[in-house]
């Protein structure tokens, strides 16, 4: 008598409509067909209404003004208006990621501090900020803080000629001159030499079993080579522009010079940094706690200081836990920047809404946003 007990015979006897692998492929095929059907149906309805699908409107005159970002006038095209929105979003997201990471790292470490007061302050900040909607925080920062600051005539002046008023913040700024192009190779050379020295230093110290970081080896070439180039070339490659309050003949007071951060940009950046920093602090705290306690005890037995333990042992091992959720927080910060429309900051979403209303190109504008 033949016995059918083999595993291979059992698999060959399973009907295809019950095979999990076949069902997965069929489900994907059905999904693709449904998506294509929806796209084709939407496109046919779109064309059936006499509408045309084209991005040629981007070359048309925008006929509206944008007060935030790079230079723009109503005679510029929709394409440049969209570029203004993209650059504004990149500005606030890039700076927000840098400052929120620093704030989150410091707060996360402070949350685990042995100092009772520091730990409680960090915990209070995290709990309050995480449980308050970001839009509420933006409204508070913009309407109750920024707009309540003194006007330009009575602006708060901080050391270094930093002006703070209800129109925003004005900072001193370095601006390149015609000699900057001759100085640029020295900057690039300094960066290359610093990276090479750091790699060589790190490999050598790792072979000896010593700490692998030395700020001196990075700082010397980064400072000496650009300074040498500054002395060799003719003219200053960069000039420091200091802001100052001036009164125009029409009686209007304004601040000239430096770089200006508008009140909307300041409120949005501050809100995103404070809000996202609280979440990053919890990510950092979870990553530090994931490192076994024995690592810290062994480092103390070897005579490491608390700073060395954190920098050389705890944080490098905690990165495997920190990085995945940290990237999610970066994406959340970028997406949350669309709330800028609540305080009239001209980010990508706000500019796109204006383009949509002016041109009537709904599908094209949303495709640009998605891209």
Predicted segments, located by residue:
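Transmembrane alpha-helices and adjacent helix-loop boundaries
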Residues: 2-371
